[in-house]
């Protein structure tokens, strides 16, 4: 792993203006991912290298999805009745500068988090509504294999937990960790699903391809999650190539995510209409199997919504109103000047298009 000092020295960066950024939002980068960067300012660079604009964004929130408010046990988030999110560690192979959980970087990796499984497991065992557990973090696939085995085994001992999911960036950011042993371990706990974070075709290195192949050959259903990022992947050519290549690797594109409203990430955010426009273009370019859902995770913990005309109830100059999974009307802020294009787009798009 690179320290920021080592990375800056290698790339000839002046660290002085970036030191306050790194202090507020620490830097982590695997040597594998750094090796995929082809030049200063390229799409991979912009995802992981600190930017002074991270300290200038006052419009976002530390915890835009209200995960702390929805946490009934340490490191557990219970937003939907039959599903929970379990943050099993705080370590990542890279610190994505657009991360929703940037607030958790400040304390550094937590060893206590990895030692005390009891409260989360007890909560899951006691609430029989919970059928689906999503392991995230951090990154669960950075855990020692014995620890990962323990977590999966203990979840499988809970009869009402039917599905286990893992969210990870390891196959693309630190693929050497995906070994035959890891793939075989995960394959013992079916039904288990792995959703992999990929944002750009340049991340699909030969090593990443091999990691995905190992997992798929173990019979593990693979999906992908992609964040729509301004100037990085916000066009149909880039995303079309990414999604087509993922599908050929047996990784089903699952979500294209609108940027969360996290403090320090505003420079990555695209207009909502951009995502809608990109998906419309993709439907004419690639197989329907390769077209993901375009999703907004509503601020305040109101849940994910796949953006379709039927879910948008009204659009104003500064905000639109979206109906969430409970039928609740939720306000979502728009970028300045975004309203006319979004209104026009949704007006001309039928429900059946989706």
PLM segments and residue spans:
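N-terminal pre-triad scaffold of radical SAM enzymes
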Residues: 26, 72-101
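Mobile, glycine- and charge-enriched loop segments
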Residues: 98-99, 128, 209-234, 325-354
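Iron-sulfur (Fe-S) cluster-binding segments and ferredoxin-like electron-carrier domains
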Residues: 99-111
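Short cysteine/histidine-rich metal-coordination sites, predominantly Zn2+-binding motifs
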Residues: 110-118
